[in-house]
């Protein structure tokens, strides 16, 4: 179910304060965050946010198309290595 419009989009306070400081100082630093649930705001465009995937921080460069999506959508948590080849030896 979608979030109610009267509530507005969600962003963790610590992430928003870090991004506001970066925008004010006009620096381009990588911001580390564990907040995969935060929504991407328009003032994040052009910055890089390192989103935690459970193992490491994945750098995500924010573009205009990403606004309104969640940070976790761009840092996959599972690595798919493909199905194993059909081996005759393992079928015994």
UniProtKB/Swiss-Prot annotation:
A biological-process GO annotation: translation
Gene Ontology cellular component terms for the protein in this record: cytoplasm; small ribosomal subunit
Pfam family, one: Ribosomal_S19
SUPFAM superfamilies for the chain: Ribosomal protein S19
Annotated keywords: Ribonucleoprotein, Ribosomal protein, RNA-binding, rRNA-binding
Transmembrane region(s): none
GO MF annotation: an example: rRNA binding
InterPro entries: Ribosomal_uS19 (IPR002222), Ribosomal_uS19_bac-type (IPR005732), Ribosomal_uS19_CS (IPR020934), Ribosomal_uS19_SF (IPR023575)
Function, as annotated: Protein S19 forms a complex with S13 that binds strongly to the 16S ribosomal RNA.
Family in the record: Belongs to the universal ribosomal protein uS19 family.
HAMAP family listed in its UniProt record: Ribosomal_uS19
Name recorded for this polypeptide: Small ribosomal subunit protein uS19
Source organism of the structure: Bacillus cereus (strain ATCC 14579 / DSM 31 / CCUG 7414 / JCM 2152 / NBRC 15305 / NCIMB 9373 / NCTC 2599 / NRRL B-3711)
């Amino acid at each position: 179910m979608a979030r109610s419009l009267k509530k507005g989009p969600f962003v963790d306070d610590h992430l928003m304060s870090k991004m506001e400081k970066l925008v004010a100082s006009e620096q381009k630093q990588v911001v580390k965050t564990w907040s995969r649930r935060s929504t991407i705001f328009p003032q994040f465009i052009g910055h890089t946010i390192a989103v935690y995937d459970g193992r490491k921080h994945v750098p995500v460069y924010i573009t205009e198309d990403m606004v309104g999506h969640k940070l976790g959508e761009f840092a996959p948590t599972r690595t798919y290595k493909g199905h194993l080849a059909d081996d005759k030896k393992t079928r015994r």
